Each structure stands twice: as structure tokens, then as C-alpha cells.
Amino acid sequence: MADEEKLPPGWEKRMSRSSGRVYYFNHITNASQWERPSGGSTVGGSSKNGQGEPAKVRCSHLLVKHSQSRRPSSWRQEKITRSKEEALELINGYIQKIKSGEEDFESLASQFSDCSSAKARGDLGPFSRGQMQKPFEDASFALRTGEMSGPVFTDSGIHIILRTE
């Protein structure tokens, strides 16, 4: 009765209008997938925080800032004037390139991220809850290792997050 088991936090079951198949959508990370996500009811382990999630995660990200970002400047551009909508178009384009295999996450992050972590191919290193803006933190902890988010909106701009550990 795997289908009756509780889904991991943020995940919901949906029906594809185009294919008529069931898929799973994470409203925290905006990720979607055909396979049922695992890990909904595991708790414990020395690296866990008692709520079934690791005490720390490691993520890389690609940030696209826009004119409404809290600091609309970056190492790439002194004054960022693009709209939020233009930033989202860029993010969605990067996601498509990564998913199609045309580009890899790390090379896009190093070329186009408005965060100084671009110099480390987007790597932010390990972090625990309380260290990042809440939407970024929630998305990072909801991802499984190796999983990439959809667009994640914070005061800094719009991110694509790749959980690496």
C-alpha cells in the first residue's frame, strides 16, 4: 500500500492533463516528477534533526537578480535593471537547458549567477536551518540529494537550487 503512505513534506499528488498520468509536485521547491518521492516517514539517525531531515544540507544555486531584489547589483553587473518577469524567463531558460542536457548546472551557475558563489560554480557549502532566507531554506531541505528545484523566489532574486549533499 505504498500509495497510501504519507508523502514527504511539500509533495502532493497531481494528475497530468496532457498524459492522464499521476505525477508528484513539490510546492516548496516547484519540482515535479513522475516517480513517487521517497523519505516521507523516516525519522532518526545521528545526522538528522529529529524531524526526519538532515541537520545540514549542501547546495549550489544559480541566482538571477532583478530590479526589485534587495541589492540589485552583482559581481557581473553594477546596476541590475531587468524586471522580475525577465529574471523568471532567464531562470526558466536555464532550467530547460539543464533538463535537456544542453548545459550543466555548474557551468551555467559560474557564467550567469548574480551571486559571488558563481566563482565556486554555485556551491554554497553546507548550511543548517536558520542560515538562509526562509524560502531558500525550505526548498533546500525539501530537495533530495541530486535533485534540482524549479524557480525559488527570495528577497535576493530568483534561484535554481541543486542539492549536492
Curated annotation (Swiss-Prot):
Keywords: Acetylation, Cell cycle, Cytoplasm, Isomerase, Nucleus, Phosphoprotein, Rotamase. Transmembrane segments: none annotated. It is found in: Nucleus; Nucleus speckle; Cytoplasm. It catalyses: [protein]-peptidylproline (omega=180) = [protein]-peptidylproline (omega=0). Residues 33-56 are annotated as: Disordered. Its EC number is 5.2.1.8. Interacts with STIL. Interacts with KIF20B. Interacts with NEK6. Interacts (via WW domain) with PRKX. Interacts with BTK. Interacts (via PpiC domain) with DAPK1. Interacts with the phosphorylated form of RAF1. Interacts (via WW domain) with ATCAY; upon NGF stimulation. Interacts with PML. Interacts with BCL6. Interacts with FBXW7, disrupting FBXW7 dimerization and promoting FBXW7 autoubiquitination and degradation. Directly interacts with RBBP8/CtIP; this interaction depends upon RBBP8 phosphorylation. SUPFAM superfamilies: FKBP-like, WW domain. Disruption phenotype: Animals display more and larger germinal centers. In response to intranasal administration of IL33, lung inflammation is reduced compared to wild-type and is associated with low infiltration by inflammatory cells, especially granulocytes, a severe reduction in Th2-type cytokine secretion, including Il4, Il5 and Il13 in bronchial alveolar fluids, and reduced up-regulation of Il6, Csf3, Cxcl2 and Ccl5 mRNAs. In addition, the increase in IRAK3/IRAK-M protein levels in infiltrated inflammatory cells is impaired. This is Peptidyl-prolyl cis-trans isomerase NIMA-interacting 1. It is an enzyme of class 5 (isomerase).
